[in-house]
Amino acid sequence: DGLVPSEGAAALVLKRLSDVEPGEKVYGIIRGSGLSNDGRRKGLLAPAADGQADAMQLALESGAIDPLTIQYLECHATGTSVGDGVEVSSIRSVYADLEHLPVGSLKANTGHLITVAGLASVLKLTGAMAQETLPPTPVDGEILEQLQNSNLKVQSSRAAWKTEGGPRRAAISNFGFGGNNAHLILEQYQPSSRPGRNKAFKQCPAPD
């Protein structure tokens, strides 16, 4: 019940999908991303549902993603009743048409990694996709009131990540001090996801 700060480090190697070589190991694809800032609306530490929803909507639009194809959402979820309640409200406004959306947060396992919180969630979900498993979030105590009787359900146990023919696809939210909001659409890599390379392009040596 409340923010539990912790420390950690994480790193990713990013590469354009068109530059992926045959047989190269790819852990996931960033299909869409959205950023917003609502810091002027309330205050440094006060979140705003509409600002968070803006970032979510931008991420979906940037990747031309149908929200109905999102199969799991990794929440920011600092563990405060006010902040988590606002986040649930923003998620429900954007993903309202989903009949059932599993949600969770790495912070229940590690605490709040502050500057690494979002990146750690990306690592968590790429690993979950590789294992074809919905990752569990430990639940201890009463479920947040705003989650009850909603389409959002905390994924409290390990389960097979089933799909209906398409790739595994998830969303990640990460919010910072001062009203900075980020939302990412992550997709499991499949060889068919890789676009064809432009064979007409050739690297030329730099002039002496």
Region annotations inferred by a language model:
Residues 1-208:
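Condensing-enzyme catalytic core of the thiolase-fold
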